[in-house]
A protein has these predicted regions:
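Core catalytic alpha/beta fold that binds nucleotide/phospho-ligands
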Residues: 1-131
């Protein structure tokens, strides 16, 4: 007999131009409020596409909040960490209240995919949970 599972999905689309404006106006303060140190360090490795990279990770965090069913008031942006495996595949990790919520939902695994152009960044988060 196969164990049944469910899928919780979150999708977000972010305008790169809006992220670029926020970075220009609030710079380090915005980065520190939304991203963990490792995320900031990894984004800085892409100086020509910095805004696109940041927008993609921002979209992934928003998609994760939607998949968790919380919105940004119940979970801090920094409670969701977007990384990469050695091959470059995006990874997602939960901390703090996001980790608490994922445990309450019984999340078995989490997947994230990110794409961006010069204008738009999009991300989908899929959480596998018991049915």
């Amino acid at each position: 007999m196969t164990d049944r599972v469910g899928l919780l999905l979150g999708l977000d689309l972010t305008e790169v131009g809006r992220v670029a404006e926020v970075l220009e106006r609030h710079g380090e303060r915005f980065l520190a409020r939304v991203f963990r140190e490792g995320e900031i360090r990894r984004s800085r490795r892409h100086p020509r596409a910095f805004a696109e990279h940041v927008a993609g990770r921002f979209a992934a965090k928003e998609a994760a909040m939607k998949a968790l069913g919380t919105g940004w008031r119940a979970v801090a942006f920094r409670d969701i960490e977007i990384g990469r495996d050695p091959s470059g595949k995006p990874l997602i990790a939960f901390h703090g209240r996001a980790l608490d919520r994922s445990r309450a939902l019984g999340v078995l695994s989490a997947e994230v995919t990110i794409t961006h152009t010069r204008d738009l960044a999009a991300a989908v988060v899929a959480l596998v949970v018991p049915a």
